[in-house]
Amino acid sequence: QAKALRKNLDMHAIGAAMTQQLFALPAWRQAGTVFCFVSMRDEPDTTAILQQALASGKRLCVPRCLPGNDGRMELVEITSLNDLQPGRYGILEPCGGRTIAALEPGALALIPCLAVDKQGVRLGRGAGYYDRFLTRFGQTGPKLLLCPEALVFPALPADEWDVPFTPGEILTENGVR
C-alpha cells in the first residue's frame, strides 16, 4: 500500500517542505554533525539538506553500502556533493571521503523510510541497513525519520530487530509528529 501511494507523491515538493521544517528546528541549528541519507527518486529530496549542511560548515556524513549481502553500511564524511557517484542499488554514495567510526554525541541523524506508524514503527526496504546502523552506531543525538504525511499510518507490523522511533522523531512536510 505504501509503495503504491508513493508513486503519486511529488517527492521534490515534499522534500522542499520538509527541508524548511528541518531548518527551523533547534536540533538542526545545534548539530555540528549531520548524518543524512542521499535520497532516491521515490524518497523526499534531501539535496538541499546536504547542500545547506556543507554551506553552513556542518560536518556531513552519508552512508555507503558495504560489499556483501549482510545489510551493512559505513559512515563517510564528505566535503562536496561531487564526492557522490552511483553505487550499490544505483544510490548515490561517496566515492572517496573519510570513513567515520562513530557519530559524535549530539550529531543529528536523518533516516529514510517507506512508511511509519503513529507509534514510530518504521517500514524500510527490508534489508535492515538503517536498523543495523542505528544499533551499531548507538545514536546518542537526535534522530529524525523523514516521512511524507501521506505515509504515516495508524499501525504497521514490527519485527524484533526494528529500531523504533518515538513521537517527536518523525518529520513530515507539515512538521514534527
What are these regions (language model features)?
Residues 1-104:
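N-terminal active-site beta-alpha-beta segment that forms phosphate/nucleotide-binding
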Residues 4, 95, 104-109, 117-121, ...:
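Surface-exposed, charge/polar-rich loops and edge strands
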Residues 34, 109-110:
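Receiver (REC) domain switch-region micro-motif
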Residues 38, 113, 172:
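Glycine-rich, N-terminal phosphate-binding loop of Rossmann-like dinucleotide-binding domains
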Residues 40-42, 114-118:
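Short glycine-rich anion-binding loops that position phosphate/pyrophosphate groups of nucleotides
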Residues 70-77, 121-123, 174-177:
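Short, well-ordered strand-loop elements centered on a beta-strand within folded domains, enriched
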